[in-house]
UniProtKB/Swiss-Prot annotation:
GO terms for biological process: DNA-templated transcription. It comes from Oenothera elata subsp. hookeri. It comes from the Eukaryota. The lineage of its organism: Eukaryota, Viridiplantae, Streptophyta, Embryophyta, Tracheophyta. The gene is rpoC2. In plastids the minimal PEP RNA polymerase catalytic core is composed of four subunits: alpha, beta, beta', and beta''. When a (nuclear-encoded) sigma factor is associated with the core the holoenzyme is formed, which can initiate transcription. This is DNA-directed RNA polymerase subunit beta''.
């Protein structure tokens, strides 16, 4: 050793970092040889000591941290309260997830920080502790898993599993924790194998991009540099960045120059810079080097191996590629993995320095209310906000940076160390964030509502995807729906009688719905879907809807016929069909063959002369095919076609034919339609007997004459029963095809006269040209009766005409004269149907009544529920489309009656005295504006009566049971409207709810300053098990009694309670759990108000989902969602876990410029904006150049930072220079745009930026181009050497293209020379290849004005562009361009 050096004796513990510093200082002082000698001695000493004091690792050395218990408990407490808020609808799923991740991450981090002091205090020489900080194996995070907690894990995709592993490996994991843990650990093992090859391939591609970059000059003469400021970055990174670089400018302190341009920076100079806190320092980097395909010594800086400037001929490109690729290989091979443990970041907080009152300037320009990313309310600062905290003896001043969230109110008292603000992590920290979609699925089935307007997503104008403009709740209102399990496929046409056997599958499903199978009978209706004749082969799918009835009803619960959407216009939509039957018939057979079916339009409005009901008389029913014949042809149309008024298209009565005759005839025949391929076993015109085999699996049911016809679709085989007669010459038979001989007109003396008492049908048949014979076929005669006795079906007051409402009875024959009727699969055919047509007189009083309104009413009489159909001539403001938005008439109830119980528009005014002794059933009418419209009832209870309009009737309070306050009573197994066991005081409010129409009544109610839109459903009907059926046009909802809860409001007397309610609850309003309805405490379940009564509220339970702006809502308003359907999708940014196994693909993503994460997307946008604005400001020739330059500079710095971030997070140090060389190659191309045509380059051709710039200068014309980011693979395939490209990928394509274009390879790179066996131009082979060009020295340096200006524009943006624009470009174009190039 050199004796002259004064050696200092240090006594302190040295770690890896200190050793590195020591070695670099030794090299500076003594050079390489001496240093290696010293280090050899250190190595020997280390091995001796390690052998003497060796340590072993045992399970007893793993000491757990004492504070772990309460930390975990605290985190669990926070998670629990978070879960509650989510349940109440205060935070949405993403906020919940994000916050729970941060809570557990913070807990885990805190434990990790506790670990070190804990070891230091209790056992400083613990082997685990020593090992984790020696740098040999393992690090703090791995030891933390052994003694702290494992924490949150990532799944194989790098997503976070939000169930943390609370145990550490010392305590042992539970089963669930073990399975979650296996995700990450398995991932580590697999990654080790797979990623090694990835890292190797990455290295190969990197080297491919930069293999030709060699140091070939000493100085390229550039004046540019990149400024580095010590204030903007941590000291360690600042030192790393500067050491080994070359200054681009002189550095002054005041007037004294402390470093000159082109001086390389050592550790001494860096320390001086840090001490003097110098302004930004400008350094030269590979980015600023002006040479096109190589690099100069000064722009590269010091050689990484020894501390001098890099030598000429050094292959720095290959060194750079290897330096970036190699750590990836090495890192994936580290076996001690963190095992997929999630690492993220926590937000910075500003805490109060002491207790006191906080004050700030509460100005709307400075702060405005917002939600934090965890869903807490906060104030967002738009600029720096000064906050003062006044404690008893001192004032603290704090400044809160812009875009931070203030978590306290003005003048609030804060405690010491309380968090008062959350600092937003700016874009300067390049977290790996990615945009993730999070789907929220419904956990119960029900109906969807939302409480705000929504936008349609622009690309899905007609779909069910909506965007939310502001924060609001989505509600899933509870209720199940009847949907059949099997495919609801039916072959039956409209109005067919259906065979019971064909519906067994649905029947089995239905019976499971009902509580008591014996009482339930079903009738099915399939919707009609027979389209045009062409579509006969493909019948659509239709849903079979159920009509469910129970014994105590007189009307059967209706359901809606659903239609195929494409046949809507032609079908009988908008109808409810309700069969009305007596219960004796119902018990005899499963599907009764007779009975009245009532047809209701969906919106409940009848026009004049529309069909109210129809009746299928079982006497006019036949089981066989045949032909109908009328005796006389006289008939006339009952109804003229009227224009349809309502936009929903109510069907008025179709003009059928009213018979002026009293009988018609039906000629039966047997028809079989067989496919063309089938083999027929009988001949045409042959006679067969009963049960003869006519095809392979078909037998005849009747005997007679066989006719076989071939048709397009198959073979029609008809069997006519009857007698054959060969006519003699005396018999005169007309040559018509068929004659009907009515009964009593045949020959009296004939032998066959006995057979003819019913009449015969004579048909002439000519099998051959010569002979013909006559077939006599039997005829069935149907007499048409006078009609049904109405008194048998309806109460007597219906038939009296004083009500202005009449029922006309019309019989019509379903099939036309002479039309053949075909039966389908053993179903019977109805020949005559009786229509009941609703009509009313146009009195002067009711002249305004264009339509009647039908609704269902459910009435209690002595514990029995009866349902009635009620038809009023009410002109309702809601039903009239012109008056639908009229605020005055907001319900069916008139507003004229002055009564104190007017709580809200849904509350009815007239009340009713009930005297149970006199009447068993009561029904009330609704009053309209005239107060004189009578109403019509179809009631099956004979002892009901109708009450006229009445005023001033006072209501008694009938509820005498003592009800506990704020009790929620579940409605179960009790009878009454909506299943209530108590008598409902105010029936009309409930009644309104039942009869209200499915009109989107959108009222904005001001409730607790919350605007709500709501929609009241049409009506609910309830069966015995407490289910409520809602015949909604879109689906049938079944509400269970479990889904409803009563909520009783306390009341002292009648008047006060009404006033109280009027401020709080209104019908259709949504109430969140924990919200207050009454003064006596919060409500316990979320839901929608169904019924408002004087002292109680019935609430339908609902589940709220909070959604923030930008979320996507799936499904339409009011749509039925099933369990597991997607309700809403959130788009949010989250950071990926920072394991190197994610890190390597990230590096690759950045280098291949794949725009997967939000950052590269932002870069692309930034690039486009720059290009646009700069060209507009500066005009063309400068605009393209400066636009492209600035874009490239921006993106280069950003890319370097991103790649460094990944490696630094793994503790890997790579010098920026290496990354810069790579990034310079992938950003050095520009794309020739198609706008400006140039003579030199093809449109969309990729050329180097410097080449574009020089060509433009030589041609003195503008070339349009824009900056373009290439990935490393594409860069390798876009080089100047086609030999290099061909040896990398796609050999045949590259060579073919090069041959076609006649490309020349100048053999400048290493690879080309290796391939053809020449000398490579690096190291010793460098000297003979490079001829120093003297041309650039001859160009005089023109110290033009332009130089300084352009430099300012490019890098400091200090001055506006006016100065360059104001000068004339064309004075000295060559010089100015040349100078720009030098600069």
């Amino acid at each position: 050793m050199d004796e002259g050096v004064n050696l200092v004796f240090h006594k302190k513990v040295i770690d890896g970092t200190a050793i590195k510093r020591l070695i670099s200082r030794l090299i500076d002082h003594f050079g390489m040889a001496h240093t290696s000698h010293i280090l050899d001695q250190v190595k020997t000493l280390g091995f001796q000591q390690a052998t003497a004091t060796s340590i072993s690792l045992g399970i007893d050395d793993l000491l757990t941290i004492p504070s772990k218990g309460w930390l975990v408990q605290d985190a669990e407490q926070q998670s629990l309260s978070l879960e509650k808020h989510h349940h109440y609808g205060n935070v949405h799923a993403v906020e919940k997830l994000r916050q729970s991740i941060e809570v557990w991450y913070a807990t885990s981090e805190y434990l990790r920080q506790e670990m070190n002091p804990n070891f230091r205090m209790t056992d400083p020489f613990n082997p685990v502790h020593i090992m984790s900080f020696s740098g040999a194996r393992g690090n703090a995070s791995q030891v933390h898993q052994l003694v702290g907690m494992r924490g949150l894990m990532s799944d194989p995709q790098g997503q976070m599993i939000d169930l943390p592993i609370q145990s550490n490996l010392r305590e042992g994991l539970s089963l669930t924790e073990y399975i979650i843990s296996c995700y990450g650990a398995r991932k580590g093992v697999v990654d080790t194998a797979v990623r090694t090859s990835d890292a190797g391939y990455l290295t190969r591609r990197l080297v491919e991009v930069v293999q030709h970059i060699v140091v070939r000059r000493t100085d390229c003469g550039t004046l540019r540099g990149i400024s580095v400021s010590p204030r903007r970055m941590p000291e360690r990174i600042f030192i790393q960045t500067l050491i080994g670089r070359v200054l681009a400018d002189d550095i002054y302190i005041g007037s004294r120059c402390i470093a000159i341009r082109n001086q390389d920076i050592g550790i001494g100079l860096v320390n001086r810079f840090i001490t003097f806190r110098i302004q930004p320092i400008s350094i030269r980097t590979p980015f600023t080097c002006r040479s096109t395909s190589w690099i100069c010594r000064l722009c590269y800086g010091r050689s990484p191996t020894h501390g001098d400037l890099v030598e000429l001929g050094e292959a720095v490109g290959i060194i750079a590629g290897q330096s970036i690729g190699e750590p990836g290989t090495q890192l994936t091979l580290r076996t001690f993995h963190t095992g997929g443990v999630f690492t993220g970041g926590t937000a910075e907080h500003v805490r109060a320095p002491s207790n006191g009152k906080i004050k700030f300037n509460f100005n709307e320009a400075l702060v405005h209310p917002a939600r934090t990313r965890h869903g807490h309310p906060a104030l967002l600062c738009s600029m720096d906000l000064d906050v003062t905290i006044e404690s008893e003896d001192i004032l603290h001043n704090l400044t809160i940076p812009p875009k931070s969230f203030l978590l306290v109110q003005n003048n609030q008292y804060v405690e010491s160390e309380q968090v008062i603000a959350e600092i937003c992590a700016g874009t300067s920290t390049f977290h790996f964030k990615e945009r993730v979609r999070k789907h929220i699925y419904s956990d119960s089935e029900g109906e969807m509502h939302w409480s705000t307007d929504v936008y349609h997503a622009p690309e899905f104008t007609y779909s069910n995807v909506h965007l939310l403009p502001k924060t609001s709740h989505l509600w899933i209102l509870s209720g199940g729906s009847c949907r059949s399990r099997g495919a609801p496929f039916s072959l039956h046409k409209d109005q067919d009688q259906m065979n019971p056997r064909s519906t067994e599958r649905e029947r089995r499903y239905l019976s499971s719905l009902s509580a008591n199978n014996d009482q339930i009978r079903y009738k099915f209706f399939s919707s009609s879907f027979s389209g045009k004749k062409k579509d006969d082969r493909s019948p659509g799918y239709s849903e079979m809807n159920r009509i469910i009835c129970t014994l105590h009803c007189n009307l059967i619960y209706p359901s809606i016929l659903r239609e195929n959407s494409d046949l809507l216009a032609k079908r009988r939509r908008n109808r409810l069909v309700i069969p009305v039957q007596s219960s004796q018939e119902r018990e005899k057979e499963l599907i009764p063959h007779s009975g009245i079916s009532i047809e209701l339009p969906i919106n409940g409005i009848f026009r004049k002369k529309s069909i109210l009901a129809f009746f299928d008389d079982p006497r006019y029913r036949t089981k066989s095919s045949g032909i109908t014949q009328y005796e006389t042809m006289g008939m006339h149309s009952i109804v003229k076609k009227e224009g349809l008024v309502d936009y929903r298209g109510i069907n008025e009565f179709k003009p059928k034919y009213q018979m002026t005759i009293d009988r018609f005839f039906f000629i039966p025949e047997e028809v079989h339609i067989l496919p063309e391929s089938s083999s027929i076993m009988v001949r045409n015109n042959s006679l067969i007997g009963v049960d003869t085999r006519i095809a392979l699996n078909t037998r005849s049911r009747a005997g007679g004459l066989v006719r076989v016809e071939r048709k397009k679709r198959g073979i029609a085989l008809q069997i006519f029963s009857g007698t054959i007669h060969f006519p003699g010459e005396t018999d005169k038979i007309s040559w018509d095809s068929g004659i009907l001989i009515p009964p009593g007109t045949g020959k009296r003396n004939s032998k066959e006269s006995k057979k003819w008492k019913n009449g015969i049908y004579v048909q002439r048949i000519t099998p051959t040209k010569k002979k013909h014979f006559v077939l006599f076929r039997p005829v069935v005669t149907y007499e048409i009766a006078d009609g049904l006795n109405l008194a048998r079906l309806f109460p007597p007051d219906l038939c009296q005409e004083k009500d202005n409402m009449q029922l006309q009875i019309v019989n019509y024959i379903v099939y036309g004269n002479g039309k053949p009727i075909r039966e389908i699969s053993d179903t019977s055919i109805q020949l005559v149907r009786t229509w009941f047509i609703l009509n009313w007189d146009q009195d002067k009083k009711s002249a305004s009544a264009e339509a009647a309104h039908a609704s269902f009413v459910e009435v209690r009489a002595k514990g029995l529920i009866r349902d009635f159909l009620r038809i009023d001539l009410v002109k309702s403001p809601i039903l009239d489309p012109r008056k639908r938005n009229d605020p005055s008439g907001s319900g069916l109830i008139s507003d004229n009656v002055s009564d104190h119980t007017n709580i809200n528009p849904f509350y009815s005014k007239p009340k009713m005295k009930q005297s149970p002794r006199q009447n068993h059933g009561t029904i009330r009418t609704l009053l309209n504006q005239n107060k004189e419209c009578p109403s019509l009832m179809i009631l099956s209870a004979s002892n009901c009566f109708r009450m006229g309009p009445f005023n001033d009737v006072k209501s008694q309070n009938v509820i005498k049971e003592s009800i506990k306050k704020d009790a929620i009573i579940q409605i179960r197994n009790s009878i009454g409207p909506l299943g209530t066991a108590l008598q409902v005081v105010n029936f009309d409010s409930f009644y309104y709810f039942i009869t209200h129409n499915q009109v989107l009544l959108t009222k904005y109610l001001q409730v607790e300053n919350l605007k709500q839109t709501f929609q009241v459903l049409q009506y609910y009907l309830m069966d015995e098990s407490g289910r409520i059926y809602n015949p909604d046009p879109r689906s049938n909802i079944v509400l269970n009694s479990f889904n409803l809860s009563w909520y009783f409001l306390p009341h002292n007397n009648y008047e006060n309670s009404c006033e109280e309610i009027s401020t709080i609850v209104s019908l259709g309003q949504f109430i969140c759990e924990n919200g207050c309805i009454a003064k006596n405490g919060p409500y316990l379940r979320s839901g929608q108000v169904l019924i408002v009564q004087l002292d109680s509220v019935v609430i339908r339970s609902a589940k709220p989902y909070l959604a923030t702006p930008g979320a996507t809502v799936h499904g339409h308003y009011g749509e039925i969602l099933y369990d597991g359907d997607t309700v809403v999708t959130f788009l949010y940014e989250k950071s990926r876990s920072g394991d190197i196994t994610q890190g390597l693909p990230k590096v690759e993503q950045v280098l291949e410029v794949r725009s997967v994460d939000s950052i590269s997307v932002n870069l692309e946008k930034r690039v486009e904006n720059w290009n646009e604005h700069i060209t507009r400001i500066l005009g063309f020739p400068w605009g393209f150049l400066i636009g492209a330059e600035l874009t490239i500079v921006q993106s280069r710095i950003s890319l370097v930072n991103k790649i460094q971030k990944v490696y630094r997070s793994q503790g890997v140090q790579i010098h920026n220079r290496h990354i810069e060389i790579i990034v310079r190659q992938i950003t050095s191309k520009v794309l020739v745009s198609e706008d400006g045509m140039s003579n030199v380059f093809l449109p969309r051709e990729l050329i180097g930026l410097l080449r574009a710039e020089r060509t433009g200068r030589a041609l003195e014309e503008s070339i349009c181009y824009k900056a373009f980011l290439l990935g490393i693979t594409r860069t390798s395939l876009n080089t100047q050497s086609f030999i290099s490209e061909a040896s990398f990928q796609e050999t045949a394509r590259v060579l073919a293209k090069a041959a076609l274009r006649g490309r020349i390879d100048w053999l400048k790179g290493l690879k080309e020379n290796v391939v053809i066996g020449g000398m490579i131009p690096v190291g010793t082979g460098f000297k003979g290849l490079v001829h120093c060009s003297k041309q650039h020295k001859s160009i005089p340096k023109n110290k033009h004005f332009f130089e300084g200006e352009i430099r300012d524009i490019l890098f400091h943006h200090r001055e506006l562009f006016d100065s360059c624009i104001s000068k004339n470009f064309h004075d000295t174009p060559e010089q100015s361009f040349r100078v720009f190039n030098d600069s």
